[in-house]
Amino acid sequence: SGEFDFGFAYDGDADRIALLSKKYNFKGDILAIFFSKHMKNPTVIGEVKCSQVMYDTINSYGKAIMYKTGHSNLKVKIKETNADFAAEVSGHLFFNDRYFGYDDAIYATLRALELIDAGFDFDLEFEALPQVYSTPEINITVTEDTKFKIIEDLKVALQNPPSDFPKIKDIITVDGVRVIFEKGWGLVRASNTTPKLVTRFE
């Protein structure tokens, strides 16, 4: 509502960032595209909840790796692979190209300001990406002792899906089950911290 070009917001310990323009609220997976686009042949790690647009776009000029949800998991993976960057949808951004590979929202702000100063138009770049429709996280309450069994049962069921089930292109099981279809994907994973199944669809 004010005469501002951008807004930056942080969580309590400033390891997550939200970046807002006058038109959009950019999630971590979209910011991963913007930042990695300015790195030379980047390797980028994303979590299983990240948009397929992120993976497809980054693979067109670098290498995208899908990994488990959880910022502690990404910290381990970025050290293991020496990737240039990692991101979670929630706004944990890890710069490892010119920084130390941990999630620092103040540093992410400086990198965003660097792009803005160079004339990078976040809104135009976002509008040039394929338009997709993504749900937020949808949580299903189960029990602590059944959540992982449900995931294992789902993996088995998907080996022989019903005849009227949409055509499956790929099944990724690095963290729960992410099923890739011709025109979208669905994810079901067990929460790390609560007796819930976490789902997301695009």
Spans of model-derived segments:
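N-terminal small/polar loop signature for handling phosphorylated ligands or for N-terminal nucleophile
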Residues: 1-19
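Phosphate-binding and adjacent anionic-ligand microenvironments
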Residues: 41-200
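Short, solvent-exposed loop/turn segments at the edges of secondary structure
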Residues: 11-14, 31, 89-90
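A conserved helix-loop-strand patch within extracytoplasmic ligand-binding domains
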Residues: 33-41
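Short acidic-glycine loop/turn motifs at beta-strand connectors
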Residues: 11-12, 21-23, 181-183, 192
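Short Gly/Thr/Asp-enriched flexible loops that form oxyanion-binding sites at enzyme active sites
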Residues: 15-33, 54
